[in-house]
Amino acid sequence: MLPVFLRPAARKDQLDMAEYYDAEAGEAVGNRFIRECDAGVERLSRFPESGTIVRYKHPKLEGCRSILVPGFEKILIFYRPLPERIEIVRILHGARDIEWVLN
């Protein structure tokens, strides 16, 4: 099992989305979002190659893969499998212009 490093931008994404779900759907949904993100990341530590290879041209996503957050199927966790760890790059809604968000 590889250690996981959550980049600051990814942590902010996660907390911002949890806050949004808290406000729009209630605290239970916000908490479930955090739990499902954490469960997805934990699975990546065991199966780092399980995500889909991303095809964006943005350099921040070079070498990245993505998985969907279970129960929140439009939310993507972008990560980079490295020999020594899994690096979580961003957690973003799939309907957004991903490359624009990264600029």
Segments (PLM) and residue ranges:
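Arg/Lys-rich, positively charged N-terminal/basic patches that mediate binding to nucleic acids
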Residues: 1-36, 40
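Short alpha-helical
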Residues: 12, 28, 39, 62, ...
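Short, hydrophobic secondary-structure boundary micro-motifs
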Residues: 30, 52-56, 100
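A short, surface-exposed loop/turn module that caps and links secondary-structure elements
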Residues: 43-70
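Enriched for short, Lys/Arg-rich terminal
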Residues: 69-103
